[in-house]
């Protein structure tokens, strides 16, 4: 018998790279979306850290009154933030090469755009990477669909809202106190608490937390014990086991008696679909609310909607909320505006009868 041996041509560098990129045996899956995700998220993270520590003040309102947000300029972890790009830039694309100098780019808040745009591109690629890994493992694609909810929320406050308002200076600052400031100003200008989509989003987030706690506690309370009383029930589980790890019938019976029968799921697939869909749909709706208010389609305003037979206003909670909104708006951009437009809608009072003459 004669054996013929042929030399196998070695795979090219590109083929080996493709195999490595798409291999599901790696400790961390990279994938083709990861080729874009990794550098963009590393760039966003690096610039965020540097700017949070050392960025100079930014002229956010475009009135030559810079606001400091970095640690080296007197802030701490709570008060520090990446200040949004200047109102003088508007929604123009403002990379480093568009500025006359690096100092000008920093003064006008260029790092904010760099971080936000790289971050959004990176998390969108993360969605694609989740789908790609699911596809290669033969799984269904719903993990990536669920992650579209937080990405939609981030895109709403960092991109859609600034574009709708005409300036990146209206975007959410990248910091703890900056986030709260953004929320207060958003309420003052758009009455978001009275927007139905936002209310549904709150129900989605809080309801999701409630359902998660209920499900976790029910499962933990109905584990099928495979161990002795002297060992943790957790040791009775073997990874990849075919048997159920908890008794869904017992959990269903408990919850059905605690509230009423039809408040409890008796189908595990329907239960877990509900647990996944409820918060995701809620966050989608919240993102839609911010996106609609970007175009000033604001929340409901019921102030002064109740009057007596003489036409006098009977104050309701809506009027208290409206007064709170006006108070927050007064505090916002106090150097750019003396008072909000809502308070300036009355008759104007003349303060000068003759235009002053200017000599020189």
Curated annotation (Swiss-Prot):
State the superkingdom: Eukaryota
- Proregion positions: 345-360
Residue numbers binding chlorophyll a PD1: 198
> What membrane topology does the UniProt entry give?
Multi-pass membrane protein
Q: Does the keyword Signal apply?
A: no
Q: Which GO terms describe its molecular function?
A: chlorophyll binding; electron transporter, transferring electrons within the cyclic electron transport pathway of photosynthesis activity; iron ion binding; oxidoreductase activity, acting on diphenols and related substances as donors, oxygen as acceptor
Q: Where is this site: Stabilizes free radical intermediate?
A: 190
Q: Which residues cross the membrane?
A: 29-46, 118-133, 142-156, 197-218, 274-288
Where is the site described as Tyrosine radical intermediate found in this chain?
A: 161
**Which GO biological-process labels does this protein carry?**
photosynthetic electron transport in photosystem II; response to herbicide
| PROSITE patterns, per database record | REACTION_CENTER
* Cofactor binding comment, as recorded: The D1/D2 heterodimer binds P680, chlorophylls that are the primary electron donor of PSII, and subsequent electron acceptors. It shares a non-heme iron and each subunit binds pheophytin, quinone, additional chlorophylls, carotenoids and lipids. D1 provides most of the ligands for the Mn4-Ca-O5 cluster of the oxygen-evolving complex (OEC). There is also a Cl(-1) ion associated with D1 and D2, which is required for oxygen evolution. The PSII complex binds additional chlorophylls, carotenoids and specific lipids.
User: What cystine pairs are annotated?
Assistant: none
Misc remark for this entry? Answer: 2 of the reaction center chlorophylls (ChlD1 and ChlD2) are entirely coordinated by water. Herbicides such as atrazine, BNT, diuron or ioxynil bind in the Q(B) binding site and block subsequent electron transfer.
Give the protein's recorded name.
Photosystem II protein D1
What organism is recorded for this protein? Palmaria palmata (Dulse)
The primary gene name is psbA
């Amino acid at each position: 018998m004669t054996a013929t041996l042929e030399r196998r041509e070695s795979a090219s560098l590109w083929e080996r790279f493709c195999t490595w990129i798409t291999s599901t045996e790696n400790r961390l899956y990279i994938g083709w979306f990861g080729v874009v995700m990794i550098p963009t998220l590393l760039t966003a993270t690096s610039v965020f850290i540097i700017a949070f520590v050392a960025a100079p003040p930014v002229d956010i309102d475009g009135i030559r009154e810079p606001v400091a947000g970095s640690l080296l300029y007197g802030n701490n972890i709570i008060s520090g933030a990446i200040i949004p790009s200047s109102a003088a830039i508007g929604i123009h694309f403002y990379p480093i090469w568009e500025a006359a100098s690096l100092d000008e780019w920093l003064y006008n808040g260029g790092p904010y755009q760099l971080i936000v745009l790289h971050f959004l591109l990176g998390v969108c690629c993360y969605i694609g990477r989740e789908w790609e890994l699911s596809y290669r493992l033969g799984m269904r694609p719903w993990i990536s669909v669920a992650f579209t909810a937080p990405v939609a929320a981030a895109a709403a406050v960092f991109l859609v809202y600034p574009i709708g308002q005409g300036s990146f200076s209206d975007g959410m600052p990248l910091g703890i106190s900056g986030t709260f400031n953004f929320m207060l100003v958003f309420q003052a200008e758009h009455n978001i608490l009275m927007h139905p989509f936002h209310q549904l989003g709150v129900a989605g987030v809080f309801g999701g937390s409630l359902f998660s706690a209920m499900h976790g506690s029910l499962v933990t309370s109905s584990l099928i014990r495979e161990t002795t009383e002297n060992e943790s029930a957790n040791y009775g589980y073997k990874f990849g086991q075919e048997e159920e790890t908890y008794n869904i019938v017992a959990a269903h019976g408990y919850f059905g008696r605690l509230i009423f029968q039809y408040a409890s799921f008796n189908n595990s697939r329907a239960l877990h679909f509900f647990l996944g869909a409820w918060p995701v749909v809620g966050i989608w709706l919240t993102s839609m609310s911010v996106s609609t208010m970007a175009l000033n389609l604001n929340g409901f305003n019921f102030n002064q909607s109740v009057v007596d037979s003489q036409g006098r206003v009977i104050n309701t909670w809506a009027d208290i909320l409206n007064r709170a909104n006006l108070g927050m708006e007064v505090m916002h951009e106090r150097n750019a505006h003396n008072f909000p437009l809502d308070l300036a809608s009355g008759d104007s009072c003349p303060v000068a009868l003759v235009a002053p003459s200017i000599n020189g």
